[in-house]
Amino acid sequence: MSFKPLHDRIAIKPIEQEEKTKGGIIIPDTVKEKPMQGEVVAVGNGIRNQKGEIHPLELKVGDKVLYGKWAGTEIEIKGTKLIVMKESDVFGIIN
């Protein structure tokens, strides 16, 4: 099963935080920060304007992005955790 977001939504695979600190201390799940970076794995077709024309999204598959801590909805497809959100919830592309 594959996943294709609709309209102006994108699917992001979060880039997980390190399990250990540089000093070797293991960080438990209860204190880990929620990821705010990820890789775009799927994009919708775009959004319609008032004239009915579809404007494609700026983001593309493979872009590394920064997004809000509480943005989107978490889903799981074939054991892979993804976050689905609107393109406007993304702050920017990481180069």
UniProtKB/Swiss-Prot annotation:
Disulphide bonds in the chain: none
Annotated localization: Cytoplasm
Biological process annotations from GO: chaperone cofactor-dependent protein refolding
GO cellular component: cytoplasm
Pfam families: Cpn10
GO molecular function, one term: metal ion binding
Domain of life: Bacteria
Coiled coil stretches, renumbered: none
Keywords recorded for this protein, A-Z: Chaperone, Cytoplasm
Function description: Together with the chaperonin GroEL, plays an essential role in assisting protein folding. The GroEL-GroES system forms a nano-cage that allows encapsulation of the non-native substrate proteins and provides a physical environment optimized to promote and accelerate protein folding. GroES binds to the apical surface of the GroEL ring, thereby capping the opening of the GroEL channel.
Subunit structure: Heptamer of 7 subunits arranged in a ring. Interacts with the chaperonin GroEL.
PANTHER family named among the record's database cross-references: 10 KDA HEAT SHOCK PROTEIN, 20 KDA CHAPERONIN, CHLOROPLASTIC
Family of this protein: Belongs to the GroES chaperonin family.
Protein name: Co-chaperonin GroES
Classification lineage: Bacteria, Pseudomonadati, Pseudomonadota, Alphaproteobacteria, Rickettsiales
Name of the gene this protein is made from: groES
